[in-house]
Amino acid sequence: MSCRELIILGCSSQQPTRMRNQGAYLFRWNNEGLLFDPGEGTQRQFIFANIAPTVVSRIFISHFHGDHCLGLGSMLMRLNLDKVTHPIHCYYPASGKKYFDRLRYGTIYHETIHVVEHPVDKEGIVEDFGNFRIEARKLDHLVDTLGWRITEPDTIKFIPEKIKAAGLRGPIMQDLLRDDHVTVNGNTIYLKDVSYVRKGDSIAVIADTLPCQSVVDLAKDARIMLCESTYLEEHLHLAKSHYHMTAKQAATQALAAGAQQLVLTHFSARYLNSKEFELEAGKIFPNVAAAEEFRSYPFPKNPSSK
């Protein structure tokens, strides 16, 4: 089974601190590396995390404020230096195309990697292929900002005792998957009677925003909701004026969405102890963690989920 985890490469907001780098988040999932909002210094954070940057296959930029994208150029150059042969898919708000180009071509280097751009100009499904369905929604921030929902496909799981009782084995199993029914010893066996559908897991990544319906829609039943919480409730006035959320607001949104786990991030440099965010949110949403750099948050596949 491929690893399924979120790795925090940085969790500070606008400026880094001695303890926190600007944000960057890596999901390793279904043999892909999904990198979200690589801030300044992301390339170096991979070294500290002991992860090869070559695992990255897709890069998502929520918006073009510097702390969410300044690491893009250096990451593309590093992947170029490492001579990766797989395509690097990049997703970003279409209105920020000129900023993407400036980051990508901001220095002199000979680009040999295959970068596939996906400028997003409308909400909904951006891409749907074998590994994932990628959805985007507009968030409520000062500039065009996208939140993301990534969902793996549903899979059919056989129920062993029912398969055995029906006398099914060997190549006929593939016939059953293809045709939805087979005949064995004069009996018609239907796929639905010997199997169940395991719903694919989803994750949600919520960057800078005020509380809004898009957050709830993106995070509905998500295994992990990675969500900004720039401020504590005592600074609610700052959250409102800068179009950010508090830990309490993030927890309220997670509860409304029915998310399974909430990971808070994007902490203002004014706070030295990020555990305060966990405590504030935990009063509303119990399964919450304040992001810690280089920590892994696994979400193993539950084979019995239906």
Swiss-Prot record:
A single Pfam family it belongs to is Lactamase_B
Does the UniProt entry include the keyword tRNA processing? yes
Major enzyme class: hydrolase
Alphabetized, the UniProt keywords read: Endonuclease, Hydrolase, Metal-binding, Nuclease, tRNA processing, Zinc
- Residue positions annotated to bind Zn(2+) 2 are 67-68, 208, 266
Its required cofactor(s), as named, are:
Zn(2+)
What is the reaction catalyzed? Endonucleolytic cleavage of RNA, removing extra 3' nucleotides from tRNA precursor, generating 3' termini of tRNAs. A 3'-hydroxy group is left at the tRNA terminus and a 5'-phosphoryl group is left at the trailer molecule
Provide the cofactor note recorded for this chain's UniProt entry: Binds 2 Zn(2+) ions.
Q: What are the TM regions of this chain, as residue ranges?
A: none
| GO molecular-function term, one example from the UniProt record | zinc ion binding
This enzyme's EC code(s): 3.1.26.11
Nucleotide-binding recorded as keyword: no
Query: Do you know which InterPro entries this protein is assigned to?
Result: Metallo-B-lactamas, RibonucZ/Hydroxyglut_hydro, RNase_Z/BN
In this chain, Zn(2+) 1 is annotated as bound at: 63, 65, 141, 208
Catalytic residues as annotated in Swiss-Prot or TrEMBL: 67
Q: How does it assemble?
A: Homodimer.
PANTHER family found in the cross-reference section: ZINC PHOSPHODIESTERASE ELAC PROTEIN 1
Protein role: Zinc phosphodiesterase, which displays some tRNA 3'-processing endonuclease activity. Probably involved in tRNA maturation, by removing a 3'-trailer from precursor tRNA.
Recorded family membership: Belongs to the RNase Z family.
NCBIfam families in alphabetical order: PRK00055.2-1 (NF000804), RNase_Z (TIGR02651)
| Name the UniProt record assigns to this protein | Ribonuclease Z
Q: Where is the organism placed in the taxonomic lineage, from the top?
A: Bacteria, Pseudomonadati, Chlamydiota, Chlamydiia, Chlamydiales
